[in-house]
């Protein structure tokens, strides 16, 4: 994996999570990783169901196999339930802060997956694109 550069969207996403991990408390961290856990559990299940007949030769088979499991889904459910318990007594302002962290994570997940789907590994401003 030499000469591989993390995409701009992946870098933005991981930088955001690392910033939260280094500067916030455990609840913020759990909320920050929830979109990833939730999406991966959902995608693993869906991809396994949709491509069951063709997965054996797919280079992403091991990825799908890991994330399609009931165990991974249950871990995601546990994470959500644990967050709900921790936030139960939080102030409305604190809940808004956590919602913002979650929404940012969802947006980052969307951009990460969209950039992979579009095979957009780098970002170039319009003035710097090849003609």
Language-model-detected regions and their locations in the chain:
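Active-site-proximal alpha-helical scaffolds that flank and shape metal-associated catalytic sites
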Residues: 1-74, 107
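Context-gated lysine
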Residues: 24, 61, 68, 85, ...
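Structural signal for well-ordered, non-membrane alpha-helices
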Residues: 38-41, 45, 80, 84, ...
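Long amphipathic all-alpha helical oligomerization modules
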Residues: 69-103
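Acidic, carboxylate-rich catalytic segments that either coordinate divalent cations
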Residues: 98-131
């Amino acid at each position: 994996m030499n000469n591989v550069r993390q995409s701009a969207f992946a870098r933005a996403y991981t930088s955001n999570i690392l910033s939260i991990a280094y500067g916030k408390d455990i609840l913020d961290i759990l909320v920050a990783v929830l979109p990833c856990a939730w999406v991966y559990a959902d995608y693993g299940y869906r991809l396994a169901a949709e491509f069951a007949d063709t997965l054996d030769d797919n280079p992403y088979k091991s990825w799908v196999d890991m994330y399609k499991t009931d165990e991974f889904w249950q871990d995601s459910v546990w994470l959500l339930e644990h967050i709900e318990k921790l936030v139960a007594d939080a102030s409305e302002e604190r809940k808004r802060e956590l919602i913002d962290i979650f929404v940012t994570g969802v947006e980052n997940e969307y951009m990460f997956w969209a950039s992979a789907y579009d095979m957009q590994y780098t970002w170039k401003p319009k003035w710097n694109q090849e003609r």
